[in-house]
Amino acid sequence: LSETLNRVNSWIENCDSKVSTILSGIGVFAGILLATDYVSKFTAIFRYMCEKKTVSSTIFLIISFLSFGLLLYGVFLLIRVLFARVNPKEFEGRGVKGDSLIFFSSIAKNKTFSKYRGKLRKCSSEQMNDDIISQIYICSLVCDKKFSLYKKGLICSLVGFIVFIIMAIIGAVLI
């Protein structure tokens, strides 16, 4: 059971590592764009399209803003992956043990070390196995949520970025 719990926790760490790397890359790329004169080029393109006031320029602006919004939404989803959201009360309705002896938040609720140690010593091996099984279940739900957000965030970010770059290239050609 401990091996299964460790495996699920490793998947959670894997997802967090992937997202951290992707967000770091996005940050570096955004820094490069902001530090160079690309911002002025984008501004010139959008100013030109706003002044043009044609159907094609309106479509261009709508697609550009939607793609940028999609990119930002994807980054938001990726950031959400990194925030812990373990609420034991959320899982009590699913039949999961609420007063865990191995979940850090439940351990911290013990007023003293000796109180926690006493609970641990009174715990039978069957109770400990049930606790581990509960933690496997909870961590699996957390892992599933993280990978779902990761996948959606990655797709939204990539699609938004690619479409935005295509629109910027089209805009640069039209100016």
Model-identified regions with their sequence ranges:
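Cytosolic juxtamembrane N-terminal segments of multi-pass membrane proteins
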Residues: 1-11, 137-143
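Generic N-terminal initiation segments characterized by hydrophobic and/or small/turn-forming residues
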Residues: 2, 20, 98-101
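Alpha-helical transmembrane segments and their immediate juxtamembrane boundary regions
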Residues: 6, 10-88, 147-175
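Acidic-enriched, low-complexity/disordered segments with a strong bias for Aspartate over Glutamate
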Residues: 16, 37, 99, 130-131, ...
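Generic alpha-helical secondary structure signal
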Residues: 77, 108, 120, 141, ...
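Solvent-exposed, non-transmembrane helices and loops of integral membrane proteins
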Residues: 88-137
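Hydrophobic alpha-helical transmembrane segments and immediately flanking/interface helices
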Residues: 127-153
